[in-house]
């Protein structure tokens, strides 16, 4: 009996090993160098981003600019000579900011100081006359609850918990305080607040307010209150003013509106696999952006890097064994409709996805990748990191893949996310400071090359998950 079980174990191990081809170190290192060399000398990502950012600009879901981006990227993918390029319809929310916002701090009647604000995505407008009220500063949703209706009713709630500067992973710092932005209005309205002001999700002190998605949950329409983000400098000024004068008033006016959903599209292009055409490997970013700035880092960079993966594979003459598909997702910022619809259609059509890679962390220097998979599979992938060491992008770690590819997870595939250096990302994120001139051409190209190299390795040595 022991011999029988030992035999079965040995056969199972041999079958598992046979499913993953033996690595050809010299050939793979040569191909990866060719990919990086090509990206740095004839990559297309920067030129694509220049047009997307400077000729089209911010691409909020449901906007004319978003549809222009759909047409532009579809045309550019068709020009690559891919095996298939098509649009996937998806219904998306339509929120319009309207005329620019205006706000001021009033310490005594007639004595005011203007501060920069921006309406949060999905927020309702103030009245046409604007909104002025006393202010209650809190650092958390818990503190809001502790104060209760008696302290909150009739006031503007000012959420002022900053991002934690000691966290080297700035995305962790963002995650630690973004609940104020997303859920703050819903929570404050339940205690009778008349409006909400949220400190911008930004580690730097500056005058750029940062927008982002917010939710009213299941609040009835007549109980919803306007919500805006204030710049970090403005937040510090408001906090300091309140500490000196609790009677300080805050005024703001915004003109945002929600409209019925409209049709938009995911943009998809692919190279069919030569050996396993039914096994699909996705690489993508989100085509929509906020309407402040031109969305170059979030996520124009991810869009053009993903497109360049297919371009670079063609330029180096590599014919993939599996189908490599670029997906430019619509509506990541305020609904995730594109990612959800892509996963729904994939399931309905019985498509087999084996790997998905997302770039949605800015166009900065690539440091490596995070992988959402089991530990045994990750250890196989981590053994490839030496190939990425010469390009300083060899930090492989377990973690999330990305918001748009997340809905594919039930298929049991390997998910991955490009991890650029994050220290400057939130200087730009969701603000008018996210502009083309802040993207370094070489850093952008290195990211596209690293993604292409990982896709190449996955295509050749896809680990067989247990």
Model-based region annotation:
Residues 177, 183, 204, 263-266, ...:
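Acidic/histidine-rich catalytic neighborhood of metal-dependent amide-processing enzymes
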């Amino acid at each position: 009996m022991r011999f029988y079980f030992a035999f079965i174990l040995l056969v199972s191990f041999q079958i598992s090993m046979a499913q993953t081809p033996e690595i050809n170190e010299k050939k793979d290192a040569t191909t990866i160098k060719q990919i990086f060399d090509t990206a740095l000398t004839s990559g297309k990502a920067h030129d694509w981003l220049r047009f997307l950012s400077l000729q089209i600009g911010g691409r909020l879901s449901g906007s004319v600019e978003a549809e222009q981006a759909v047409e532009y990227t579809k045309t550019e993918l068709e020009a690559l000579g891919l095996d298939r390029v098509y649009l996937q319809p998806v219904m998306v929310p339509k929120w319009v900011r309207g005329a620019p916002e205006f706000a001021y701090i009033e310490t005594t009647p007639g004595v005011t100081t203007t501060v920069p604000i921006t309406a949060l995505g999905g927020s309702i407008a103030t009245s046409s006359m604007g909104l002025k009220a006393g202010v209650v500063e809190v650092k958390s949703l818990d503190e809001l609850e502790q104060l209760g209706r008696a302290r909150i009713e009739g006031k503007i709630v000012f959420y002022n918990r900053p991002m934690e500067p000691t966290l080297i992973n700035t995305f962790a710092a963002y995650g630690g305080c973004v609940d104020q932005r997303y859920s703050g209005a819903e929570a404050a309205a339940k205690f009778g607040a008349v409006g909400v002001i949220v400190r911008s999700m930004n580690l730097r002190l500056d005058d750029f307010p940062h927008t982002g998605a917010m939710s009213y949950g299941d609040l009835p329409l007549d109980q919803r209150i306007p919500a805006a983000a204030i710049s970090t400098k403005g937040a510090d000024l408001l906090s300091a003013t309140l500490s000196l004068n609790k009677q300080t008033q805050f005024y703001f006016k915004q003109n945002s509106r929600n409209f019925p959903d409209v049709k938009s599209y995911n943009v998809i292009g692919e190279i069919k696999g030569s050996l396993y055409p039914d096994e699909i490997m996705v690489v993508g970013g989100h085509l929509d952006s906020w309407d402040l700035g031109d969305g170059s880092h979030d996520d124009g960079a991810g869009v053009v890097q993903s497109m360049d993966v297919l371009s670079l594979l063609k330029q180096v003459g590599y014919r993939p064994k599996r189908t490599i598909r670029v997906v430019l997702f619509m509506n990541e910022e305020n609904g995730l409709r594109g990612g959800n619809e892509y996963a729904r259609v994939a399931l309905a059509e019985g498509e087999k996805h084996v790997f998905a890679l997302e770039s949605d962390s800015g166009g900065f220097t690539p440091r490596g990748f995070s992988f959402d998979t089991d530990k045994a599979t990750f250890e196989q992938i981590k053994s490839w990191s030496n190939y990425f060491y010469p390009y300083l992008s060899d930090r492989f770690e377990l973690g999330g893949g990305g918001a748009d590819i997340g809905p594919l997870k039930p298929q049991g595939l390997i998910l991955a996310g490009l991890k650029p250096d994050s220290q400057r990302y939130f200087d730009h994120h969701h603000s008018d400071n996210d502009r083309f001139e802040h993207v370094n051409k070489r850093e952008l190209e290195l990211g596209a090359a690293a993604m292409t190299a990982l896709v190449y390795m996955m295509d050749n040595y896809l680990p067989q998950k247990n």
